[in-house]
Amino acid sequence: MTDLNKVVKELEALGIYDVKEVVYNPSYEQLFEEETKPGLEGFEKGTLTTTGAVAVDTGIFTGRSPKDKYIVLDEKTKDTVWWTSETAKNDNKPMNQATWQSLKDLVTNQLSRKRLFVVDGFCGASEHDRIAVRIVTEVAWQAHFVKNMFIRPTEEQLKNFEPDFVVMNGSKVTNPNWKEQGLNSENFVAFNLTERIQLIGGTWYGGEMKKGMFSMMNYFLPLKGVGAMHCSANVGKDGDVAIFFGLSGTGKTTLSTDPKRELIGDDEHGWDDVGIFNFEGGCYAKTIHLSEENEPDIYRAIRRDALLENVVVRSDGSVDFDDGSKTENTRVSYPIYHIDNIVKPVSRAGHATKVIFLTADAFGVLPPVSKLTPEQTKYYFLSGFTAKLAGTERGITEPTPTFSACFGAAFLTLHPTQYAEVLVKRMQAAGAEAYLVNTGWNGTGKRISIKDTRGIIDAILDGSIEKAEMGELPIFNLAIPKALPGVDSAILDPRDTYADKAQWQSKAEDLTGRFVKNFVKYATNEEGKALIAAGPKA
């Protein structure tokens, strides 16, 4: 049994006093009772749905609040954190010690004299590189969320649990002094890397706790040479590991969920001396337009112990997954064992031999697959390119490019080149190959079919792409296969999908200009400057 007196003393050391009761690492059964009990009001209230899962609302915060994210500027962070600047804006805004202390006082005062849920878990399936996390909250469903998302310790591990990092969630409190303190709003998500504490105020969005710890793994791991990556990962029957990087909507979850392979994880991973390991103990899946037919694994994972966020629940308790009236970002969190085809008992495997960058190019320029050199790997990893189609009033659809460093700029705490260095070093040691896979559009105006994309992924994973005869795509100087089994050869060179190849040329020059302009911010150090040659040249 965990010594609750010890836990109370540790809470007092944080500034949380006169706690009425500590509900320590509650069971799923207990959480279910707590979040559905009569008398709960507002966003604390859980609603039982016909799926068996409980649904909650997070109010106006239906996604992360990057504008309210701050990191304390001190001796430890001043020269290590990738701070926002005029030339390279990001979400790492500095906060002084006095402001931090006032926010900490607000949160600890909010949590004092309350009945609290304290959940201890691990971030990272690697014993050597994990962070022991303690989450303190007064809200039952928030305790449920972190029980789903972090790795659940055994009874034995809980006996002597020493937290490396504490998340204090004070979602009910806001900051009245934000204007004088020069902050963005009354809400805050603040980190102190010296005290190893995250404070949350004002926002009820569950993902702040998950992505907050991801940002911290992104700080601590690369500094000791361990990869920290925004990617999904799976492993084949022979132990061959593949990792899939990609921004939202590029196919990261869909393509890594493969009946022929076991899932390691769907979102956050590390790469250490043993191999690839999941940071999480659960999945946080989008549910908008979810159907059993299209995503059977996720659909079937929504049952008792899963937690739905911001979905529309009908009067009979059924869920309308097509209703995005609260937000398009409807979500479900569930423990990873709700998915059948997973790596057990620990979500980790050997070194990755295939590294896949997914992009959905709405410009119709990039090839469906290309093999990258080590320099190109760094260049396209730092660029983190994808493009969306946005409708205009005349009915013309124009592509909007997105460049997100390392396919996850919102969560990077160090300079992007540090992640690229670690990735390429790990890849070289493992003899891994990198591929750029475009799941977007080509000259036909249609999106590349999921059948062809799956054929491409199969060719990468079974090694047949290595035997293919290769050509080169000009401007980008990318190596592209001339034929692949099960894939329409007519699409492999994007120029061939245009009736007029000059059209591809002009679009390629346009996209090149955007890549070049975006990459300027990385040319501030020698490594960055050296990579310019690996990018496209008009």
From Swiss-Prot:
Top-level taxon of origin: Bacteria
- Where on this chain does substrate bind? R64, Y205, K211, R331
Q: Which residues bind ATP?
A: 211, 230, 246-254, 295, 331, 447-448, 453
Reaction(s) catalysed by this chain, per the record, are: oxaloacetate + ATP = phosphoenolpyruvate + ADP + CO2
**A single GO molecular function term of this UniProt record:** ATP binding
The terms describing its cellular component in GO are:
cytosol
Q: Would the keyword ATP-binding turn up in this protein's UniProt record?
A: yes
What cofactor requirement does the entry state? Mn(2+)
The residues that hold Mn(2+) are K211, H230, D267
Alphabetized UniProt keyword annotations: ATP-binding, Cytoplasm, Decarboxylase, Gluconeogenesis, Lyase, Manganese, Metal-binding, Nucleotide-binding
Subcellular location(s): the record lists: Cytoplasm
Report the EC code(s) recorded for this entry: 4.1.1.49
Q: State the Gene Ontology BP annotations.
A: gluconeogenesis
What family does the database annotate? Answer: Belongs to the phosphoenolpyruvate carboxykinase (ATP) family.
Q: What does this protein do?
A: Involved in the gluconeogenesis. Catalyzes the conversion of oxaloacetate (OAA) to phosphoenolpyruvate (PEP) through direct phosphoryl transfer between the nucleoside triphosphate and OAA.
Question: This chain belongs to which protein, by name?
Answer: Phosphoenolpyruvate carboxykinase (ATP)
